[in-house]
Amino acid sequence: MARAIVLRQLTASPKSRLQLERKLAERNVPEDVAAAVLDRFAEVRLVDDAEFADMWVRSRSQSRRLARGALRRELADKGIDADTAASALGQLSDEDEEAAARHLVERKLRAGTDLSDRAERDKATRRLASMLARKGYQPSQAFRIVAEVLDAAAAGAPAGEDSGEDPADWE
């Protein structure tokens, strides 16, 4: 029964060992049986927290454009230890993270916002920096990127032009 539960869970989507342990506990599988089944799945590499963490970071950083801080929290919630999480997060460069943040801000910047009006600019800054903070970006980085994008938008130039980035790399 425990093996069938684990297989069904892994068929739906990749899972960490802790997620599978929790699911087995929900189904009242004895701990020793759960441990034995999960150990066997780990031996045949069907349960591999390092591989799960790598996949999770790749997927979430591309689809949701989350920063390392948010990804680290998500991995911890899924039972991934700090060393494994750090290794998985190593695949994200500072440049990738900054480009993702810049792309988010440019996409969320409302067309028609009057950036010459100080109150409107402050409102846009707060809204965009808060959005980046919710995605795990550091406040200093968030405010810097928002200011750069707003300055570029106020000047009428796409923000990617003055940053030396190729907009084709943003997607």
What is each model feature region?
Residues 1-171:
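An alpha-helical, amphipathic repeat domain used for nucleic-acid recognition
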